[in-house]
From Swiss-Prot:
Protein's UniProt name: Aspartate 1-decarboxylase
Function: Catalyzes the pyruvoyl-dependent decarboxylation of aspartate to produce beta-alanine.
Gene symbol of the encoding locus: panD
Highest taxon of the lineage: Bacteria
Enzyme class: lyase
Electron transport recorded as keyword: no
GO MF annotations in UniProt: aspartate 1-decarboxylase activity
Active site per database record: 25 (schiff-base intermediate with substrate), 58 (proton donor)
Spans through the membrane: none
PTM-bearing positions, type Pyruvic acid (Ser): 25
Family: Belongs to the PanD family.
GO cellular component: cytosol
NCBIfam families registered for this protein in UniProt: panD
Length: 126
């Protein structure tokens, strides 16, 4: 059986641009794409922590080291500059591949600069 599992996420990045009339997608600083193992044109889920919106689009490269997180096209109506986002990617895994599977969790500072990459989500206390 294949299961759709979290592959990676960019945790609490800050939206820098919302470009309604751009062709579409979400431009992400190339350093962050690499840290999260997200390829250009890969589907991503975006969860807006600020307003609760959730939507899917695809990733494109923004200039390396720029800190850019630009939500483009119609999705620009779902995020504004300054909004905090979680950007997640998923992959399908066979059950045998899941032993030891741990998604990449990428953390940033307020300028979307990489601060830490973790390999597991801690257990939430009661």
């Amino acid at each position: 059986m294949q299961r759709n599992m979290l592959k990676s996420k960019l945790h609490r990045v800050t939206t820098t641009h919302a470009e309604l009339h751009y062709i579409g997608s979400c431009a992400i600083d190339e350093n962050l794409l690499e840290a999260a193992d997200i390829l250009e044109y890969e589907e991503v889920q975006i969860w807006n922590v600020t307003n609760g919106e959730r939507f899917a689009t695809y990733a494109i490269k923004a200039e390396r080291g720029s800190g850019v997180i630009s939500v483009n096209g119609s999705a620009a109506r779902r995020a504004a500059p300054g909004d905090l986002l979680i950007i997640a990617s998923f992959a399908q895994y066979e059950d045998a591949e899941l032993k030891g599977h741990s998604p990449k969790l990428v953390f940033v500072d307020g300028d979307n600069r990489l601060t830490e990459v973790k390999g597991a989500t801690p257990t939430q206390p009661a």
